[in-house]
Amino acid sequence: MLKMGVLLFTFLVLFPLAMFQLDADQPVERYAENKQDLNRDERMKIMLSALRQRQCCDWEWCDELCSCCW
């Protein structure tokens, strides 16, 4: 009887839950699809603004953890 309960629980509860798409995944996918429609100049503008936001260390405090010094 226990085996049948485990089997029913697996197929009636766990298996259907694995088939649902998570809501958290959908906005990211839509955002990626929207980015494919941008022209080259708009994509370059987004990339350059993201690169400018990166912080760099000063030369006095440069060590192996700082990526801009190397």
Swiss-Prot record:
Residues 1-24 form the signal peptide. The lineage of its organism: Eukaryota, Metazoa, Spiralia, Lophotrochozoa, Mollusca. Expressed by the venom duct. Disulfide bonds join C56-C68, C57-C66, C62-C69. The modification Pyrrolidone carboxylic acid is found at Q55. This is Conotoxin Lt3.4. Residues 25-54 form a propeptide. Pfam families: Conotoxin. Belongs to the conotoxin M superfamily. GO terms for molecular function: ion channel inhibitor activity; toxin activity. It comes from the Eukaryota. GO terms for cellular component: extracellular region. Keywords: Disulfide bond, Pyrrolidone carboxylic acid, Secreted, Signal, Toxin. The cysteine framework is III (CC-C-C-CC). Classified in the M-1 branch, since 1 residue stands between the fourth and the fifth cysteine residues. It is found in: Secreted.
